[in-house]
């Protein structure tokens, strides 16, 4: 059996940035911590519905629930509720070993039955798991004490990686069957480091440390997470001392705040990227329009001027840390060529091509301002784009229904660094996470889903990335650096996935 515990990305301690250490101003009272969070939590089931694939709320889910296989802050795999996992030699079966002695938040024992039920539920189309097409690839599970085997229906090279990613959470079988979906929303339980004490939708979440957590009780006894979706309000929260930790604030505010007495921070590159979806509707069916829209954008200028040098430009949906990153794939910034392409389709600055671009505002640092700047760059070459602002939840709703505007800004998270979970799901037509449906790309990607030769698989994805860049099927923008500001009385470990985890925080 091959146990898949290899590190996915080449981060070491240095790449993580220092664990930021400071002194005084301990959170309000000993054992109390308040965090100003940037998004609301729409649902408590981390395995169903649009919220399950929202990378920005995974830190909340990971505080209450455990994933099958956890990731360390550098994104390497670690033993968790599964202590061993892997395939047999011909990849026809999987084997897993389940940690013993773990309890759910209600005191009931966690068992291998919970693992199997969670996997079967995730693979059932009726459940509503947005990643069901991955989980259905293994069935016929058998339990022998704390050992589990399953039959591979269709080989998926990233099956175990998904156990550390979106929807890869273990749910409580007996409790869920007892209370049902509605009861679970009212009183969720997991095996994670924190238990839900109180939850007010669109207001706050109060967590209480799990004294029986298998990984050790967290340092902070009580954690209050305020849902503060406005970036300026998050700045006020941390500056006033009302909150001791916040994230995703404008970079100029980050620089200003960490220079103040009593505050510190970290701002390292994470696995998130900023991108613009192109939907294969209306004017986006014209390759000249797409290529012009890509060539007109000066990504380096966006990073240097708008993001104050934080983050880095990208030309594909892969960052340098992802497995299929290919530095040879370059897309030039060439406004003159963009004008020529538009002219060939009958457009000019005097007679511009028109479409709508959708974006969030304050969800990520400078998201709206970045789109404003891009619209300005487009205007100079003959593209007139009108901006429509929406909440992130609306983006998921529209994307799942394939009803995004011709262009839509988005923050794509890929904590496992695999090309299937970046290029694959973002551009493969049948995926519920893509709005580009052209058959040429579908045909090119299809053989890669089940490719057993890892070298061939990664090379295949690199070829897909090159083709997408040539056809301008998407507009990759930047790899994000995530700003976190905190009181010097709190130590914060930045997680490369972008998840802000109170269980990793300690008093200084």
What do the PLM-derived regions correspond to, one by one?
Residues 92, 288, 384-395, 421-488, ...:
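Extracytoplasmic/peripheral linker and loop segments enriched in polar/acidic and small residues
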Residues 37-89, 120, 189-190:
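N-terminal lobe/hinge region of extracytoplasmic solute-binding protein
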Residues 201, 343-414, 428-429, 454, ...:
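Ligand/substrate-recognition segments at binding pockets and active sites
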């Amino acid at each position: 059996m091959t146990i898949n515990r290899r590190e996915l990305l080449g981060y070491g301690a240095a790449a993580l940035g220092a664990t930021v250490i400071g002194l005084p101003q301990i959170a309000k009272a000993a054992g109390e911590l308040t965090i100003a969070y940037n998004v609301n939590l729409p649902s408590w089931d981390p395995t169903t519905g649009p919220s399950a694939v929202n990378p920005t709320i995974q830190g909340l889910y990971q505080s209450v629930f455990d994933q099958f296989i956890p990731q360390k802050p550098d994104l390497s795999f670690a033993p968790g509720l599964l202590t061993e996992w892997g395939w047999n030699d011909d990849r026809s079966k999987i084997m897993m070993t389940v940690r013993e002695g773990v309890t759910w938040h209600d005191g009931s024992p966690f068992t291998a039955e919970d693992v199997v039920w969670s996997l079967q539920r995730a693979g059932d189309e009726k459940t509503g798991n947005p990643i069901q097409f991955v989980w259905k690839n293994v069935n016929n599970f058998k339990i022998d004490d704390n050992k589990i085997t399953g039959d591979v229906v269709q080989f998926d090279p990233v099956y175990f990686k998904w156990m550390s990613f979106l929807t890869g959470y273990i749910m409580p079988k007996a409790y869920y069957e007892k209370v049902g979906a509605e009861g679970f929303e009212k009183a969720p339980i997991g095996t994670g480091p924190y238990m839900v004490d109180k939850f007010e939708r669109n207001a706050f979440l109060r967590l209480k440390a799990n004294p029986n957590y298998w990984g050790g009780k967290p340092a902070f006894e009580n954690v209050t997470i305020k849902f503060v979706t406005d970036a300026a309000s998050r700045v006020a929260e941390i500056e006033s001392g009302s909150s001791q930790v916040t994230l995703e604030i404008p970079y100029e505010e980050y620089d200003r705040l960490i220079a103040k007495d009593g505050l510190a921070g970290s701002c390292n590159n994470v696995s998130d990227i900023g991108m613009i979806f192109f939907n294969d509707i209306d004017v986006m069916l014209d390759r000249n329009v797409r290529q012009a829209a890509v060539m007109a954008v000066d990504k380096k200028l966006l990073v240097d001027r708008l993001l104050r040098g934080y983050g880095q430009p990208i030309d594909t949906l892969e960052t340098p840390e992802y497995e299929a990153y290919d530095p040879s794939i370059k897309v030039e910034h060439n406004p003159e060529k963009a004008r020529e392409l538009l002219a060939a389709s009958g457009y000019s600055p005097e007679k511009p091509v028109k479409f709508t671009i959708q974006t969030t505002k304050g969800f990520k640092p400078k998201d709206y301002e970045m789109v404003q700047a891009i619209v300005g760059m487009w205007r100079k070459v003959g593209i007139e784009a009108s901006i429509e602002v929406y909440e992130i939840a609306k983006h998921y709703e529209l994307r799942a229904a394939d009803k995004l505007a011709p262009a839509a800004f988005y923050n794509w998270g890929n904590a496992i660094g695999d090309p299937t979970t970046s290029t694959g799901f973002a551009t493969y037509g049948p995926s519920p996470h893509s709005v580009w449906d052209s058959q040429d790309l579908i045909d090119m990607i299809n053989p890669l889903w089940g490719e057993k030769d890892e070298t061939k698989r990664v090379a295949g994805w690199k070829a897909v990335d090159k083709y997408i860049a040539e056809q301008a099927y998407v507009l990759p923008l930047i790899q994000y650096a995530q700003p976190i500001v905190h009181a010097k009385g709190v130590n914060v470990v930045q997680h490369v996935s972008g998840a802000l985890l109170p269980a990793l925080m300690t008093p200084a």
